[in-house]
Amino acid sequence: MVLDIDMFRTEKGGNPEIIRKSQQDRFKDPKLVDEVIELDEKWRKERFVADQLNRQKNAISKAIGEKMKKKEPQGTDDSVADDIVARLAELKIDELSQLTVVQLKKLRVLVDEKSVQTAAAVIANENARHEKLIQIGNLIHSSVVVSKDEANNKIERTFGDLSTKKKYSHVDLVVMVDGFDGERGTVVAGGRGYFLKGPLVFLEQAIIQLALQRLNVKGYVPLYTPFFMRKEVMQEVAQLSQFDDELYKVSSKGSEIAGDTSVDEKYLIATSEQPIAAYHRNEWIKETELPIKYAGVSTCFRQEVGSHGRDTRGIFRVHQFEKIEQFVLCSPNDNESWTLFDEMIGNAESYYQELQIPYQVVNIVSGELNNAAAKKFDLEAWFPGSGAYRELVSCSNCLDYQSRRLKVRYGQTKKLSGEVPFVHMLNATMCATTRVICAILENNQTEEGINVPTAIQQWMPENYRTFIPFVKPAPIDEDAKKATGKK
């Protein structure tokens, strides 16, 4: 995930000041821009010398051939003057013609040695430049609020009654319908482990079906993704911080060959956005094939490092969950990606309106954007039992930031020269099932149980078609009784 390097080159029409401003607006170090420019200049100088040396090697070989053809004396002394060696990459043809065959052969050896050194310098500078480049975020859209404080997220619009209060939170409700076992889940899987059971298994499948059916009508192709990604591919779609805070690493045998002791590193996906972004890796996509719309279906795995103490009970924030994701590839022209951005957040809004879940859509402040997003909208549902807004959807336009590193190019033919455009990529949650379950439970609770939203009743079994009864007491009430008893 990177910006176009030409954006840092003024002679190529780039404007580094725009990138510095974007970095400042993200509350990130703008000095990275200057470091990229410095390393790029070093890289270009070494690249120029490497090209010169390559041409010089060909010229020397040609000069040797001509002398051999003319049967000129080859000479016995291969020593070459220091001033010639110093100008190894700049020697002219007439200077080469004055040297003997053995001198030219010595010169060719020196060119080869210098080429190896220069090639190493080219690679070193390119790698150093890349390490700095990937730390610089996408250019922020002008409509993003510049702030580091999430309290300044701009509310774009709302739906439903956002003032209602209800008795129980999702933490209690999942237990009351006997749809969750966290104690056994923790024994089996560790912290935040859980078993989903009974009515909530059916509810989860109904939520998924509604999402897939609605996206299918909109032309989104369902794509069930791998759960693992190779390290080198994951590095092209994930930020460095995600490797430490979010991603699970899995080590296994490098091959199925008996006796092979090599180790293969893979990473569990945190979202289907990651494998789908890489689905067209190293491909050229014709204009007539765009936009390409996918409905990603996957289990997601997240370490949730940094979330210690947050949402430790229930199923709102867990290490493993199911998710339906919108992912779109489109033309980089005519602001098409911004039109699709509106469509994708609109798809999510329609979905939650069908489920009658109240929400607000917020424009995320600049300091809270991930590197890839030029702009991000979150859909935050109102949880009347918790008395809080909770994020259910994130919708991001990443422009060509992801596709550039993945080399997903836009066009019909492979261009040998000139600017190569890349497709734009967008992603938006449709539903992260455990979070949607929590929202449904809190918003549809009654004294006796949970009213099932009309939109998903067709996928529920007869005994839970319209209503899921409470069959266990609320943990919060049980805790209160115990506390009273102790007194």
UniProtKB/Swiss-Prot annotation:
UniProt keyword Aminoacyl-tRNA synthetase, yes or no: yes
Broadest EC class assigned to this enzyme: ligase
Reactions it catalyzes: tRNA(Ser) + L-serine + ATP = L-seryl-tRNA(Ser) + AMP + diphosphate + H(+); tRNA(Sec) + L-serine + ATP = L-seryl-tRNA(Sec) + AMP + diphosphate + H(+)
Molecular function terms from GO: ATP binding; serine-tRNA ligase activity; tRNA binding
Coiled coil (residue ranges): none
Gene3D superfamilies: Bira Bifunctional Protein, Domain 2, Serine-tRNA synthetase, tRNA binding domain
Binding site for ATP: R302, Q303, E304, V318, E391, L392, V393, S394
EC number(s) from the headed UniProt entry: 6.1.1.11
GO-annotated biological processes: cytoplasmic translation; seryl-tRNA aminoacylation; translation
Transmembrane parts of this sequence: none
CDD domains in the record: SerRS_core
Residues bound to L-serine: T271, S272, E273, E325, T429
Domain of life per record: Eukaryota
Family indicated by similarity: Belongs to the class-II aminoacyl-tRNA synthetase family. Type-1 seryl-tRNA synthetase subfamily.
Comment, domains: Consists of two distinct domains, a catalytic core and a N-terminal extension that is involved in tRNA binding.
Name under which the protein is recorded: Probable serine--tRNA ligase, cytoplasmic
